[in-house]
């Protein structure tokens, strides 16, 4: 869903939704010749693992996209400031990780607005992108929030296993050009898997970009 326009390019997966908001290039090289891929992290900031992740991303020269929970933003503003200072893209993931479709429009908008306000308080910018929990968005909110919904192409279900090798293999085996990878920064195994994914895909010639560059470049 992009500015209220449905793009019928949704891919099925084991989770409630597994799709991206823009069509895939199906392996066709981009105009600038780069093989692009975006790595994204949900549910942060996490006091134990986000800084570890940021250090590894910086070491590898990678820019990522973080979809943050408002309640965690309020608890760990310094980590949010670090994410922003490192040049990563920050999006909204709701305030309390609730299924927005189960809420009234007013309550759903509050989940978004409270998170956006918390992020703005730290970064001075309001997020433009939202990844709704479970991939469940209320389409009529497109006109209320003016945010761009971003889902995903590859979901290794990293929250179901503590084996970083398994997580990494699930991604590397499936990922393609212009795909958006879904991970979380709430466990050591997910962070280690992210590093393994990045290292392997960089060896394969991929360049990591933010979701904004996937959607609009």
Where are these regions (language model features)?
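Hydrophobic membrane-insertion alpha-helices, especially the h-region
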Residues: 1-5
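Residues marking helix boundaries in flexible regions
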Residues: 6-8, 199
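Short, compositionally biased "basic patch" segments
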Residues: 8-10, 14, 20-23, 133-146
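Active-site beta->alpha N-cap acidic-glycine motif
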Residues: 14-111, 118, 125-126, 198, ...
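Catalytic domains of cell-wall/extracellular-matrix polysaccharide-remodeling enzymes
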Residues: 98-207, 212-217
